[in-house]
Amino acid sequence: MPKLKTRKAAAKRFKVTGTGKFMRRRAFRNHLLDHKSTKLKRHLATKAVVDERDADNVSLMLPYS
């Protein structure tokens, strides 16, 4: 059986934690930041955990993670 291919777009967007969960970047921190508060921008700079309902799809895209 051939090796499974990794979806490169997903590999750039998600990282796996030691417990097997996936970390992702938060949205809304790309542009149009003038009217957003410093507190909000600081919060958006942190990583978030991928929801458990989406984790199965992410793991299919990253077979060797």
UniProtKB/Swiss-Prot annotation:
The UniProt keyword set, sorted, is: Ribonucleoprotein, Ribosomal protein
User: What Gene Ontology terms describe what this protein does at the molecular function level?
Assistant: structural constituent of ribosome
Q: Which GO terms describe its biological process?
A: translation
- Keyword check for Ribonucleoprotein, yes or no: yes
- Mention any one GO cellular component term assigned to this protein in its UniProt record: cytosolic large ribosomal subunit
Q: Which PROSITE patterns match?
A: RIBOSOMAL_L35 (PS00936)
**TM stretches of this protein:** none
* Pfam families, A to Z: Ribosomal_L35p
NCBIfam families annotated for this entry? rpmI_bact
HAMAP family linked? Ribosomal_bL35
Q: Which family does it belong to?
A: Belongs to the bacterial ribosomal protein bL35 family.
Q: Quote the protein name from its UniProt record.
A: Large ribosomal subunit protein bL35
Origin organism lineage? Bacteria, Bacillati, Cyanobacteriota, Cyanophyceae, Synechococcales
Provide the gene name from the record.
rpmI
